[in-house]
Amino acid sequence: MITIKKGLDLPIAGTPSQVINDGKTIKKVALLGEEYVGMRPTMHVRVGDEVKKAQILFEDKKNPGVKFTAPAAGKVIEVNRGAKRVLQSVVIEVAGEEQVTFDKFEAAQLSGLDREVIKTQLVESGLWTALRTRPFSKVPAIESATKAIFVTAMDTNPLAAKPELIINEQQEAFIAGLDILSALTEGKVYVCKSGTSLPRSSQSNVEEHVFDGPHPAGLAGTHMHFLYPVNAENVAWSINYQDVIAFGKLFLTGELYTDRVISLAGPVVNNPRLVRTVMGASLDDLTDSELMPGEVRVISGSVLTGTHATGPHAYLGRYHQQVSVLREGREKELLGWAMPGKNKFSVTRSFLGHLFKGQLFNMTTSTNGSDRSMVPIGSYERVMPLDMEPTLLLRDLCAGDSDSAQALGALELDEEDLALCTFVCPGKYEYGQLLRECLDKIEKEG
């Protein structure tokens, strides 16, 4: 067991009940183009086209051969683009059950399948995009290979679902997915989990590793740091546990599996719980009549790293397994910093709220102050469990010094790995965005 001592479990109200319920009927689904780092689409559909489930919608011209497919059958009703014609979303009005089918196999055949057969089926179905590289967090090139695949079978994000509930409901598919991954690499498959019991693959290159401690103990970046540190030469891939299930379903049934069990939670959700929905689901549909009155912000993903789901982005993200909802914090509080703060949370123990152990707070979107200079008072070190110098790294990110940032370990990181640093930062810096700019610069310069 690897125990993480530094970190932070955010004490936010609205914890979901860990029972899986059926979600609302979803009328629209979408693929969100900006989720895929560096992707440039070649469109295969236009507005008005009828599509089958698993039919190709677009390809990545910068990563030849990588295909993005429809999560449901229906009619393409929107192709949304932003500044510089960046693809924001391809929206499908759900109708019918037509789908593209693929080869199916017996469970005993999976571990012996040829690697090219596996790659071809994953690419054609669109499930290849479930894999992400580290460094850079991109969809792997089809011809690339890795010696380490990390399965994130735990989740320490605030308000998250317990993965074991979902995995144990789909044991056969989860094991089949692990067998597929074991055949996809000559190296190891690291299944990273909490102390709970999960179904195990019999393949010799599939290893289980237990992590314990506060967030970010459940992040792929943390697991890689301790088990297979990445750099420009050592490239690892990661995948979440629900996509492992989808891998297994694809090869066992010959059909694209796009079901998702997500956490719908937060301080302004009427009944926080786990709901069964579909990949790319419209969050307007999913949250209909689920929220308390007032101005709220719906977030696809965690409150720490998710995206504001509004307009053309109001859909469940490809890599997200929760929907979080917060009240918009627009009210200004006179001399709020001088108040006792019984109902306020502070990492630096600035308020009385820290005296009440176990208290959950009705957090809002307020940043509790304006932008200011970066202040190194030890907060970053308190929430960073990785063996690196966070204050120095964050300073270099702010300064745009990619050479120094790379020397300090920036290539190991993804935006989610710096989310807690953003949360505790007195200067209100968005370190995830700064990290992405740095990684783009490093990749461009080679």
Swiss-Prot record:
<keyword id="KW-0406">Ion transport</keyword>
<comment type="subunit">
    <text>Composed of six subunits; NqrA, NqrB, NqrC, NqrD, NqrE and NqrF.</text>
</comment>
<keyword id="KW-1278">Translocase</keyword>
<dbReference type="GO" id="GO:0006814">
    <property type="term" value="P:sodium ion transport"/>
</dbReference>
<protein>
    <recommendedName>
        <fullName>Na(+)-translocating NADH-quinone reductase subunit A</fullName>
        <ecNumber>7.2.1.1</ecNumber>
    </recommendedName>
</protein>
<dbReference type="InterPro" id="IPR056148">
    <property type="entry name" value="NQRA_2nd"/>
</dbReference>
<dbReference type="InterPro" id="IPR056147">
    <property type="entry name" value="NQRA_N"/>
</dbReference>
<dbReference type="Pfam" id="PF11973">
    <property type="entry name" value="NQRA_SLBB"/>
</dbReference>
<dbReference type="Pfam" id="PF24836">
    <property type="entry name" value="NQRA_2nd"/>
</dbReference>
<keyword id="KW-0915">Sodium</keyword>
<comment type="similarity">
    <text>Belongs to the NqrA family.</text>
</comment>
<comment type="function">
    <text>NQR complex catalyzes the reduction of ubiquinone-1 to ubiquinol by two successive reactions, coupled with the transport of Na(+) ions from the cytoplasm to the periplasm. NqrA to NqrE are probably involved in the second step, the conversion of ubisemiquinone to ubiquinol.</text>
</comment>
<keyword id="KW-0813">Transport</keyword>
<dbReference type="InterPro" id="IPR022615">
    <property type="entry name" value="NqrA_C_domain"/>
</dbReference>
<dbReference type="InterPro" id="IPR008703">
    <property type="entry name" value="NqrA"/>
</dbReference>
<keyword id="KW-0739">Sodium transport</keyword>
<keyword id="KW-0830">Ubiquinone</keyword>
<dbReference type="Pfam" id="PF05896">
    <property type="entry name" value="NQRA_N"/>
</dbReference>
<dbReference type="GO" id="GO:0016655">
    <property type="term" value="F:oxidoreductase activity, acting on NAD(P)H, quinone or similar compound as acceptor"/>
</dbReference>
<keyword id="KW-0520">NAD</keyword>
